[in-house]
Amino acid sequence: MAKIIGIDLGTSNSAAAVMEGGKTTLIPSAEGTTLGGKAFPSYVAFTKDGQLLVGEPARRQAVTNPEGTINAFKRKMGTNYKYKVNGKEFTPQQLSAFILQKIKKDSEAYLGETITKAVITVPAYFNDDQRQATKDAGAIAGLEVVRLVNEPTAASLAYGIDKVGKEQKILVFDLGGGTLDVTIMEMGAEGTFEVLSTSGDTQLGGTDMDNALIDYIAEDFKKTNGIDLRNDKMAVQRLKEAAEKAKIELSNVLETDINLPFITADASGPKHLAMKFTRATLENLVRHIVERCKASIDQAVKDAKLTAETVTKIILVGGPTRMPIVQKFAEDHVGKKAERGIDPMECVCFGAAVQAAVLTGDVKDILLLDVTPLTLGLETMGGVRTSLIDRNTTVPAKRSQVFSTAADNQPSVEINVLQGERAMAKDNLSLGRFMLDGIPPAPRGVPQIEVTFDIDANGILHVSAKDKGTGKEQSIKISSSTKLSKDDIDKYVKEAEQYASEDVKRKEEIEVRNEADNLIYSVEKSLKDHGDKVSADERLIIEQSLTAAKDALKGSDVATIKSAKEALTTASHKLAEVVYKASQVQDTQGAAQGQSQGNPQQTADNRGKVVDAEIVDENKE
């Protein structure tokens, strides 16, 4: 069976893994180890000439191309937000698809086979729109998303794969670049992983810490120099890199230096930023962000009907959990030491790879029981939200409830599907609406309308409404304003393919340019050394062809460059013959000279030859 890879599609960095021979293996990016370890930085960039850069190449040029570089777009998944770059608009799904395409390509190179399927992780607190947007991104990238797995659940799988047989209640504290998830899991002795509860915040993460650092550094510089660096996009990008680097370094040391020479300039000349930055300063800046995690921990423990004392293990997931202040906060608040034998940056993609292996049948002793993070319901009379599937219900799940009309002879009902915890419909997220019409005239309260909510293993919802009197039925697979239509997906797939074909064209252009440039150099050198050995007419033709080739290189038309290169090759044939003959004469003279000198010719004759030899043990008879 074809391999299914596991992907952690992250806000700051993404990662991929596969299970082979019973072990999970990290799939490296083509660029190797970077600031984010072996991961794929979640950066997409468009250069001024329209070239697409993804991952580490995009991150590396962010300082010099801030307007063309985009990251942290995961925070906008499931919204109508559009990113504008070089006059074009891109949805978060498209940008995520570029990352997934890069992962797909590098995975295929690493594994040596075509990859068409993936398990992708999402924050546990992602709503239906955000989950559907993630599946759409996979489709654009040419990947069938066979399962969406909540990130904390994936981390638990990675932790527990070699601990099946032990009953444990695990609190997964997942603080990533852009989101917070707290999940309580019960690991059964038989290999079951059941999610008891989940809570979180999709707008809380390491990016908020970076922003706090950037503001602090910018304010400090402003006090000294009277210049606000936040008004300069290139300076902000340099600050962003410096803040992230300092945050990472201060997880291991107590003090670091931030040095940004030539950060800006004014009438007095260039300005340099140099400051010492301590762990204590960092912790004071981010403490209020870390404290915001408290409510989600308490909510998850409460929903699981547990107390902090009954939690067996704490697993820390996500880059920011490497920070001592975050580790201490989680351990102090729960009253347990965190599990150290798991890499917070890699465990989510490892867990996704485990789930992929479960789906292919390579792993048979694990059963994953996940939950829906938010309550699902519909709007009823008076604008009230009536719930059908409560939050933290194990998925897949199916619930039905009978409703009726609110007015006499009402011919139709509108089903407004809601997601959220608020009592009033208007305060929750509307996932979609549909009409059930053709209801026969009857007094209010008499018709029986059965509404069924069916949520699949990916957490994606299907809703149907049936008039039990007539048997008439309508259904909807949630298609809110933020979900991409099939046409949208097809369009974006073509755009993604277009970028891939443009890369091929660009590579071809570079190769042709290099060939032409090398030929021009070679012909010019030969003309300088041996030009007097060809006729004036032949020399003129060569010089004209050289000029034409140089002019062609000034443009970008590959066909013109190819044609000029071929013309120069033809024109320089006579010159090549002269050079070849001169070389032969030189070799003949050298051979004659060598014969008169004895032993040195022996060395010259053998130079460049390979002689196979056998090692002989002289002591052996």
Swiss-Prot record:
Q: Which UniProt keywords apply?
A: ATP-binding, Chaperone, Nucleotide-binding, Phosphoprotein, Stress response
Residue spans of biased composition, Basic and acidic residues class: 606-621
Domain of life of the native organism: Bacteria
**Which residues does this entry mark as bearing Phosphothreonine?**
T179
User: Tell me, what's a Pfam family for it?
Assistant: HSP70
Inducing or repressing factors: By stress conditions e.g. heat shock.
Comp. bias intervals (Polar residues): 583-605
Q: Residues annotated as region Disordered?
A: 583-621
Query: Which family, according to UniProt?
Result: Belongs to the heat shock protein 70 family.
The name this protein goes by in its record: Chaperone protein DnaK
Q: Which organism is it from?
A: Endomicrobium trichonymphae
Q: Lineage, please?
A: Bacteria, Pseudomonadati, Elusimicrobiota, Endomicrobiia, Endomicrobiales
